[in-house]
Amino acid sequence: MCLNTLCAILCFVLTVSFGFVSAQKCGESVFFRPNGNYDTNRRLVLSTLASNVSSQNNRFYNVSVGEGAGRIYALGLCIPGSDPRVCSDCIQLASQGLLQTCPNQTDSFYWTGDNADKTLCFVRYSNNSFFNKMALEPTHAVYNTMRFQGNLTAYTRTWDAFMNFMFTRVGQTRYLADISPRINQEPLSPDLIYALMQCIPGISSEDCETCLGKCVDDYQSCCNGFIGGVVNKPVCYFRWDGYKYYGAFGDEAPSQPPTPLPLPPPPPRDPDGKKISTGVIVAIVVSAVIFVVLVALGLVIWKRRQSYKTLKYHTDDDMTSPQSLQFDFTTIEVATDNFSRNNKLGQGGFGEVYKGMLPNETEIAVKRLSSNSGQGTQEFKNEVVIVAKLQHKNLVRLLGFCIERDEQILVYEFVSNKSLDYFLFDPKMKSQLDWKRRYNIIGGVTRGLLYLHQDSRLTIIHRDIKASNILLDADMNPKIADFGMARNFRVDQTEDQTGRVVGTFGYMPPEYVTHGQFSTKSDVYSFGVLILEIVCGKKNSSFFQMDDSGGNLVTHVWRLWNNDSPLDLIDPAIKESYDNDEVIRCIHIGILCVQETPADRPEMSTIFQMLTNSSITLPVPRPPGFFFRNRPNLDPLTYGSEQGQSSSMSVPFSIDSASITRATPR
């Protein structure tokens, strides 16, 4: 009896020690005006969602409210059969969490997942209808860092078989919580698997199985060998552990009954043959139980501080699970065929880039940093730490890294269509970029920069936005790459200063070149140059020999603008496909971005609104930075060298730009 009590206490202690992190995901780029129709409708829907969900027999409710830009679609659900009051409290908590965490995003969702919760619930809202639609991203994952003890191979076989068994049943019901047969294992390892799978009602059974299958795959790829984990997506949720949770398993018994305990031995006797009193036995047992519980609590507190790792796919403050991101050098060699010339994709800012294939047939891009690249250990760690925190469809995703044999290697997702400059500046290839695609590229880069500057947990300054750092996927959608020069800001920080200016000549703003000052407005300037290049189809440096433009695109465009002839800038390759108003608006936005004074340049959120809302009146632009009125005044530092390559120079802040020393471009 005492043994059973002790086990129950220990199980309770261990259970409450492992709290899962709730998954709040705010929309990436689209925002609404506070106190507008959408905001009013959102608050109305979320204020009534808890009662509406809990009153449904299946604990599921969706609704749409409003018209036009103020229309909102919302959905809430709990575990089927959960107590109405518990469900209502959970939905209310999730709704309040979204209002606080996502104050003006038009598309957000929230899965709860704390052990203190008595159920699992989900809330999502959007300005676009998502009912009955499949969505596999974004992903949120959590795993327990307590490793499995025992025969992992045998346990994994059982785990896989049980998950396959779950798959065969969950597609039709959209919800399943089940317990595996008992497994004979080591004392410190679980002998039961408690698994829960749930999909949003409305998606097909095939989509449900696909989503949950992806969740299981994601868990296995990051966290195999650990005891317990959660992976969730916008339309499905998966969790497994070695104990009950969420009230989902009730008093359900395992498939195989436990082996009965042996009968207790007769009471012990003292040396004189007398029975030891019951009071003495109780005192000894209680003392032992208290001692063991105190030790267990101490271990739990220590373990809890480091037990659960959250893989929010690049949103934590530190590097995301370095162990799961790190590749060994042999794997990289095999994947790239020993860095074969046939697999070389090109030369990046700090080294060569190769295509590779992992054993699971995942295509990768391998960035092998050259020993004399100038990107030392600091830049390498910088890129890994920053990129590992990011997740956005317009940013290249980091898969891992390798530091071995004096090599520094970054492994990225493979983006099939090379970089923007490969198409944009080639006389033959540029025909593949009609105006619709170019306009889409401008919009995608805008969304990516907006995420970096505002929507990610850190404010991140890329510092090297240019055509060669914009990769294109199979559908010509843009992805921002090469974060070796990126810097992150504190929440309350708006600008910084550096004694080592890095970037690409022609894309760097004047305050950065001359004084080393950088902010989000530095990226805005570079983006403005990129917009103008996309419109005209020419490199910034190609204007060095044109008329009296002073050798740069910015001066050339400013003169065309003042002469009321901005359409003279248009690339002949898009003469048959461009939209007159869109082109002029993009040129106008580009000029606003390259204004000399940083305060005059718009924020990326404003640029996004300018691009997506044609009714917004654009301000009159002021003269751009590096505007040259005649060729003799050309700045040799910035425009007398080969442009397009990332470079570095030292900036003594106490003197003016004439004292800047220039280093050889990498």
Swiss-Prot record:
Write the signal peptide boundaries: 1-23
Membrane topology type? Single-pass membrane protein
Where, by residue number, does the polypeptide cross the bilayer? 281-301
Q: Which residues carry this modification: Phosphothreonine?
A: T504
Q: Give the EC number.
A: 2.7.11.-
* Entry keyword Ion transport: no
- Provide any one GO MF term from the record: ATP binding
Spell out which residues are annotated as carrying Phosphotyrosine. Y412, Y512
Instruction: Name the predominant localization.
Output: membrane
Q: Which residues bind ATP?
A: L345, G346, Q347, G348, G349, F350, G351, E352, V353, K367
Q: Which PANTHER family match?
A: CYSTEINE-RICH RECEPTOR-LIKE PROTEIN KINASE 31-RELATED, RECEPTOR-LIKE SERINE/THREONINE-PROTEIN KINASE SD1-8
**Can you tell me which family this protein belongs to?**
Belongs to the protein kinase superfamily. Ser/Thr protein kinase family. CRK subfamily.
Q: What is this protein called?
A: Putative cysteine-rich receptor-like protein kinase 31
